[in-house]
Regions:
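Short alpha-helical DNA-recognition segment
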Residues: 27-45
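Helix-turn-helix DNA-binding elements, focusing on the entry/boundary residues of the two helices
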Residues: 19, 30, 41, 55-58
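Short basic helix-loop element that most often maps to the first helix and adjoining turn
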Residues: 17-33, 91-99
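Short, charged recognition helix plus adjacent turn
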Residues: 72-99
Length: 99
């Protein structure tokens, strides 16, 4: 993927499009999804239109669509770009967690 395609706003738009697609595949109206996951229908509508939503509301929608494990896996493994970055990560692992 091109570096210019890795912008947060594009990710937000893609996530919103994917959520809308899952909702429509399941034949759910926004109101029905809202009742199931506890996120107000106007919030779902705004998310689908703009990509903007709170993390809590996004998680509620994703869990309703059974994506708990996939969301839990985000940021769960180490990623690095250079050998220097990997060395730094390994050094930091020896530090006390949370400090």
């Amino acid at each position: 993927m091109d570096i210019y395609e890795r912008q947060p706003d594009l990710l937000m738009t893609r996530l919103a499009q994917n959520c809308k697609a899952r909702r429509l595949e399941k034949g759910l109206s926004r109101n029905t999804l809202a009742a199931k996951c506890g996120v107000p229908a106007p919030t779902i509508e705004r998310f689908e239109r703009t990509g903007k939503i709170s993390l809590e509301s996004f998680c509620r929608i994703a869990v309703e669509f059974d994506y708990f494990d996939e969301l839990s896996a985000i940021l769960s493994r180490t990623k690095y770009s250079t050998s220097e970055e990997l060395e730094s990560i390994n050094r930091n692992r020896s530090r006390i967690k949370g400090r």
